Design a protein with these regions (language model features):
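Bacterial Sec-dependent N-terminal signal peptides
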Residues: 17-35
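Hydrophobic/aromatic-rich core segments of domains that either
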Residues: 130-214
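Alpha-helical and coiled-coil interaction segments, frequently adjacent to or embedded
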Residues: 192-194, 199-254
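Sec-dependent N-terminal signal peptides
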Residues: 6-14
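Secondary-structure boundary elements
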Residues: 35-123
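Positively charged n-region of N-terminal signal peptides that target proteins for export
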Residues: 1-5
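Short N-terminal edge-element motif at the start of the domain
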Residues: 100-103, 108-122, 126-147, 151-152
């Protein structure tokens, strides 16, 4: 359990995370924060068609794993049952066969899944989620990558407390006729609401989803500045989402 916790910390991107220890992200909301968005028709699905899961068996450009590489993986781990333990088999294989290289967030959006597979290297949660979701898709699990920002970070960044960035990238997986949330370290939420952008974490650091797609190129992230701009936009409008914060309290399993 200790190893899994450390690994999860390593995947919390980008450079450093400046945050306060708070049991409730709303503790920061003692003043009025801005909202400059039209919330009347705000789309929390981010264009994902959840009622048509088969669409997410088709990879994006970045996540199109070579058949040869997938065949190598099948030789090692075999075929997988359409179950959560089957999904976790891929996470376990990834965690034991890829090496983490700390690039300080500079590799976000830079490599395709094939380039990452060839080097057996990942640079943080963006590349980890890309590898895992791409492989799961080849095994027949529809997958969607989600990009999130720390709610605590959004307040701190707006207040000028930090200039660094804090968030996380994970995967939504369709299995047994429902969408679950999968972290890169193999922990997961089975009772998951894919239309709620707020995500409660094990350590009470709430996350807020701001982008989704088949891979990060699919939702427009080609370099670190794309992620930074999306996060800054969330921070600049954090007051729009007060009613969503702490709206769910997930139980994480492994």
């Amino acid at each position: 359990m200790k190893t899994k916790s450390i690994f999860s910390f390593l995947l919390f991107f980008l450079i450093t995370l400046s945050c306060k220890n708070s049991d409730n992200v709303l503790d920061n909301n003692e003043k009025d924060y801005p909202c400059n968005l039209n919330m009347e028709n705000y789309d929390y699905s981010f264009g994902v068609q959840y009622d048509n899961s088969q669409l997410y068996l088709t990879p994006g450009t970045q996540s199109d794993l070579n058949d040869e590489y997938f065949e190598e993986i099948v030789i090692i781990i075999g075929t997988l049952p359409n179950t959560i333990p089957g999904i976790l088999t891929v996470c376990d294989w990834f965690n034991h066969n890829f090496t983490f290289e700390n690039a300080g967030g500079n590799m976000i959006g830079q490599k395709s899944v094939n380039e990452l597979y060839e080097s057996k290297t990942f640079y943080g949660c963006h590349s980890a989620a890309l590898i895992i979701s791409s492989i799961l898709r080849e095994f027949g699990f529809p997958t969607v990558m989600i990009e999130t920002a720390s709610v605590e970070w959004a307040y701190d960044y707006f207040d000028g407390v930090t200039q660094s960035f804090g968030g996380h990238v994970m995967t939504e997986v369709y299995v047994l006729e429902k969408w679950i949330l999968l972290d890169n370290n193999g922990t997961f939420v089975e009772d998951y609401d894919c239309m709620n952008p707020f995500i409660s974490t094990i350590d009470n650091q709430g996350l807020f989803t701001y982008a989704k797609g088949k891979d990060i190129w699919d939702y427009g992230v080609r370099d670190p500045s794309d992620t930074h701009n999306m996060m800054i936009n969330f921070s600049d409008n954090v007051g729009c989402f007060d009613d969503k914060f702490n709206s769910v309290n997930y139980e994480w399993d492994n």
